[in-house]
Amino acid sequence: MTFPDSKFASVADYAVAYFDQAKAAAQSVDQEKLEAALTCLDAAYERGGTIYACGNGGSAAISNHLACDHSKGGQTDTDLKPKVVSLSTNMEIITAIANDISFDDIFVYQLRTLAEDGDVLLTISSSGDSENVVRAARWAKEKGLDVIAFTGFDGGRSTKLATVNLHVEGDNYGVVEDTHQSLMHILAQYIRLKRMDDGTIQERKF
């Protein structure tokens, strides 16, 4: 059953139902795969690899936010120097590729220039089936890069291309994106947290 499937009497009623959906979506995340995603990111950071993230629309916003929180947050109060790039952020490059080549190639075209052995691609797509995301994931897999996929709905083609698929059970874009945003924050904050001194943790707001 899709959500919503009917009108609600008030915004308060809709909020209650929405938060119920959000709770179920969060609880659907496979904890072992969350640990696997953490291990993948940790290993890349420790060996000096770069994390590339990409997504469209709301997922592009999460990709950009990920670059901020992992890059700035990850090195605050730690000895880590995370290298993180959102492929969704440079509109000049994106529109040039989309206009001259294809919108389907806006991410993979950048990866071909930037990515190196030991890097990681993190894709964000509610459907898991956005063509430009799928092309980037396929290229990364073929080149031996680890791929972490944030997916929702039925997972799409990204499911089979990912080294680690963090799937959210849900069919509402807002609910899935909210959960993807939370997963991004959880990973970013934990990567920082595990490297901080105990005393410093209590002095900081996360």
Feature-to-residue mapping (PLM):
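Buried hydrophobic positions in well-ordered alpha/beta secondary-structure cores of metabolic enzymes
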Residues: 40-41, 55, 70, 107, ...
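Glycine-rich, small/polar surface segments that engage phosphate groups of diverse ligands
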Residues: 43-115
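Short, glycine/polar-rich helix-capping loops at beta-to-alpha or helix-loop-helix junctions
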Residues: 150-162
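A short, well-structured juxtamembrane/interface segment
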Residues: 29-47
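A charged, well-structured terminal subsegment
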Residues: 113, 176-206
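Generic N-terminal amphipathic, Lys/Arg-enriched alpha-helix
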Residues: 1-28
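Short glycine/serine/threonine-rich phosphate/pyrophosphate-binding segments
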Residues: 59-64, 129-136
